[in-house]
Amino acid sequence: MSDPKPTRSQGDLAETLELLLDKGVVVNADIAVSVGDTELLGVELRAAIASFETAAEYGLDFPTGTDMERVTAAAGVDADDSKSVLERPDPPTTEGSE
């Protein structure tokens, strides 16, 4: 009897990528290197990976120069709702918090 071997179809990568872009992924990472009480290095990573359609549905901001008419049309957002996607208010800032 032969040993079972893992199988992989050609569509695995494409299907995984499609699912990832359809649902979206958010990565948050905080890395700190310290010696004693002294922080030597600090890295904060915030990344969101999604298709334009998914990002528009969740109201994420887009880089300058993005053709927002195509994005809202692809996301199925109504013209009235597109203002909420196109014109996001800036997040409130807290002065003196540092």
From Swiss-Prot:
CC per GO annotation: gas vesicle; vesicle membrane
This protein's major location comes to: other
Q: Which domain of life is it from?
A: Archaea
What are the Basic and acidic residues biased-composition ranges?
80-90
Where's it found, cell-wise? Gas vesicle
Looking up InterPro entries in the UniProt record yields: Gas-vesicle_GvpA-like (IPR000638), GvpA (IPR050530), GvpA-like_CS (IPR018493)
What would be an example GO MF term here? structural molecule activity
Induction of synthesis: In PHH4 (a deletion of the p-vac locus) transcribed in all growth phases, maximal expression in mid-stationary phase. An unstable 6kb transcript able to cover gvpD-gvpE-gvpF-gvpG-gvpH-gvpI-gvpJ-gvpK-gvpL-gvpM is detected, as well as smaller transcripts. Gas vesicles appear earlier when grown in static culture, possibly due to O(2)-limitation.
Q: What does this protein do?
A: A minor component of the gas vesicle. Proteins GvpF to GvpM might be involved in nucleating gas vesicle formation. Gas vesicles are hollow, gas filled proteinaceous nanostructures found in several microbial planktonic microorganisms. They allow positioning of halobacteria at the optimal depth for growth in the poorly aerated, shallow brine pools of their habitat.
Misc. comment: Encoded in a 14-gene locus called c-vac which produces cylindrical gas vesicles only in the stationary growth phase.
Name of the featured protein = Gas vesicle protein J2
